[in-house]
């Protein structure tokens, strides 16, 4: 094993980079394993020191000492995990198959360490007499609960079974993710006839030509990555090709090849159920929701069914309108199928509001949007962004910014990574390389390093990166998460930034999306990339008018994912049936479009099978209720109102997980959230 002083490994010692940012330019794949093993060894030594401490267990020598342990390991794992998502390759994925079980075993060794838990329990049992601050109380509560929820009270055979199941789960979720990425990257629809491109915007045709050319092929290549797939489904006049691409996308990881996830879905659901039952819960949802605002399955189903009842009649009406438009063109027997939905929706939107994504795209050049989004944060919170090319990055497309607070003090490092590439998973996310905390010895507020990662439309030879309106919303969403990370101001790492209840974490991101249709915000940056013309008021008016177009269908789609998630994780017996049939039964009440028997969401539903959203997908809708209610205060007082922005920063963004989210929310809003604000915003309730 490499010694920690080994100068060859950049993870050891100080980085000697601006703000001690990750030295990506010096990190090679072979550096991860020795650094992770060394990190495990060091944390084990730190834990041994806690256990062997001859003094009586107290908050400082046990709870704080435990929270501060594992600094090297956390640093290395943050980089390793982020690279697996944003810049992976075969070597890294092979290493992950070895590393992830090791990390799972190490985690188990900690939470199943009886002597360590005995000390934690000793402090927990005297918590009332300790006169702790709110943050200290929260840290103690979290530490104790974390041990209990990870098997500390299990004995004998049950302990060993817990170890086996959690290690198995870490392998399964990793394989699920890898299969998804590989299957997505493996597919390409190559078109060689120009007439096959009918209806497609020029920018999409150019991008497809460049994709083909980059692989030495003639013609136009369309992929399952969002910037290629979504525009094709929206604009292609060729129904057969839409169906072909739709089927490729919606049957991912169901084929008879090495990327099939059918059995893995069953194994993940069953393994999670067994873990929950081993810990004394009836199912995995009950286990998960104990640490959520929702608290139990009943609350989740209540929300989903409330929304279903409110939105279903409007969604049926939306489908009827689109069906009528399609029949005007195709005849009375025509049935709108899922591969027709985006195409005819776009036509109807154009007809009703005279607006579509391509009309707006020229006004959303990426650099301008970036200025607008950064400028919004400056307007609301007084922070500024300065690009620093001295900060190492992991890919040439990535940029690094220093962020400064309104008093000029350094606040955070923000990385931006905007475009798809083969080593990057689909979707968009915010992540962290370094959490914020306050160093107890020096009193220094150690500032965070966060990153936003997207898969936006790429620039072509002839055009800069021009975003769709949907991509602008996505940027605002992920940037909202990054603000939650950057404004963190907690004493302890584990309570800082986005370390909050899962159904609260989407509030800071979703509230930012509200600005996307605000004229005063759009006017700050939306300029035509060729003429410099400001986005016309008339287009903004149409954009606002169209903002609730098909909103009920979109809501039902999210509800259906929430129902599917809950169906997998409220099971209390192992699942051995047909995954596709189970899926269709689970979400049938929220389906508007005809069922396609071959399609399957579960096999590619990374959120709930490989990400953190198992028994948690409802949290998007939960947070939407919160964000609509919260933004109504901005609307009432003015969208750039300093008082409201300061209150949101001080009561929510900077607080992390230091208090229960409902207490924080009420402190900001002055009341509990009401579903009415969302129904009014969406035009469901007048």
Describe these PLM feature segments:
Residues 41, 45, 49-56, 72-89, ...:
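Intrinsically disordered or highly flexible coil/loop and linker segments, enriched in small
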């Amino acid at each position: 094993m490499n010694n920690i002083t080994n100068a060859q490994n950049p993870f050891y010692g100080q980085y000697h980079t601006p703000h001690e940012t990750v030295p990506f330019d010096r990190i090679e794949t072979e550096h991860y394993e020795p650094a992770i093993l060394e990190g495990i060894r060091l944390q084990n030594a730190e834990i041994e020191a806690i256990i062997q401490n001859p003094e009586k267990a107290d908050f400082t020598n046990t709870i704080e000492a435990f929270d501060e342990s594992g600094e090297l390991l956390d640093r290395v794992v943050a980089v390793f995990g982020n690279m697996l998502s944003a810049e992976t390759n075969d070597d890294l994925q092979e290493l992950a198959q070895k590393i992830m079980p090791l990390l799972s075993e190490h985690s188990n060794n900690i939470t199943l360490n009886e002597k360590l838990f005995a000390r934690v329990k000793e402090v927990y049992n005297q918590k009332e007499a300790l006169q702790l601050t709110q943050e200290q109380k929260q840290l103690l509560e979290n530490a104790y609960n974390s041990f209990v929820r990870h098997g500390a009270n299990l004995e004998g055979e049950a302990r060993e079974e817990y170890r086996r199941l959690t290690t198995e789960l870490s392998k399964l979720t990793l394989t699920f993710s890898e299969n998804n990425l590989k299957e997505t990257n493996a597919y390409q629809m190559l078109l060689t006839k120009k007439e096959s491109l009918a209806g497609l915007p020029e920018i999409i045709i150019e991008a497809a030509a460049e994709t083909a050319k980059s692989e030495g092929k003639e013609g136009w290549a369309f992929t399952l990555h969002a910037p290629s797939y979504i525009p094709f489904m929206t604009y292609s006049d060729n129904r057969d090709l839409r169906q072909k691409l739709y089927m490729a996308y919606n049957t991912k990881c169901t084929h008879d090849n090495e990327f099939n996830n059918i059995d893995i879905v069953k194994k993940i659901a069953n393994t999670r159920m067994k873990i929950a039952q081993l810990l004394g819960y009836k199912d995995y949802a009950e286990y998960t929701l104990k640490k959520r605002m929702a608290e139990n399955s009943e609350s989740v189903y209540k929300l989903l069914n409330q929304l279903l009842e409110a939105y279903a009649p409007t969604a049926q009406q939306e489908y009827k309108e689109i069906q009528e438009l399609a029949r005007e063109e195709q005849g009375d027997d025509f049935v709108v199928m899922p591969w027709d939905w985006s195409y005819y929706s776009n036509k109807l939107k154009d007809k009703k509001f005279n607006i579509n994504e391509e009309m707006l795209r020229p006004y959303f050049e990426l650099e301008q949007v970036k200025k607008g989004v950064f400028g919004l944060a400056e307007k609301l919170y007084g922070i500024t962004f300065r690009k620093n090319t001295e900060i190492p990055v992991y890919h040439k497309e990535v940029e690094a910014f220093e962020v400064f607070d309104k008093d000029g003090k350094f606040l955070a490092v923000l990385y931006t990574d905007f475009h798809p590439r083969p080593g990057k998973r689909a979707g968009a996310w915010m992540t962290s390389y370094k959490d914020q905390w306050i160093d107890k010895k020096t009193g220094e507020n150690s500032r965070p390093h966060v990153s936003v990662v997207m898969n936006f439309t790429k620039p072509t030879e002839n055009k800069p990166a021009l975003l769709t309106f949907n991509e602008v919303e996505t940027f605002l969403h992920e940037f909202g998460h990054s603000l939650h990370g950057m404004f963190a101001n907690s004493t302890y790492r584990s309570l800082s930034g986005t370390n909050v209840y899962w159904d609260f974490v989407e509030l800071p991101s979703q509230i930012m999306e509200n600005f996307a249709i605000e004229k005063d915000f759009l006017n700050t940056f939306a300029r035509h990339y060729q003429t410099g013309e400001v986005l016309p008021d008339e287009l903004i008016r149409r954009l606002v008018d169209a903002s609730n177009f098909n909103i009920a269908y979109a809501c039902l789609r999210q509800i259906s994912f929430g129902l599917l998630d809950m169906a997998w994780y409220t099971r209390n017996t192992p699942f051995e049936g047909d995954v596709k049939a189970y899926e269709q039964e689970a979400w049938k009440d929220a389906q508007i479009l005809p069922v396609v028997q071959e399609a399957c969401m579960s096999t590619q539903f990374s959120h709930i099978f490989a990400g953190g959203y198992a028994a948690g997908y409802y949290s998007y809708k939960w947070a939407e209720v919160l964000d609509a209610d919260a933004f109504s205060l901005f609307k009432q007082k003015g969208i750039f109102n300093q008082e409201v922005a300061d209150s949101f920063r001080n009561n929510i963004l900077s607080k992390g997980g230091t208090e229960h989210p409902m207490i924080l929310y009420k402190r900001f809003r002055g009341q509990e959230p009401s579903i009415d604000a969302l129904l009014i915003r969406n035009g469901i309730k007048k």
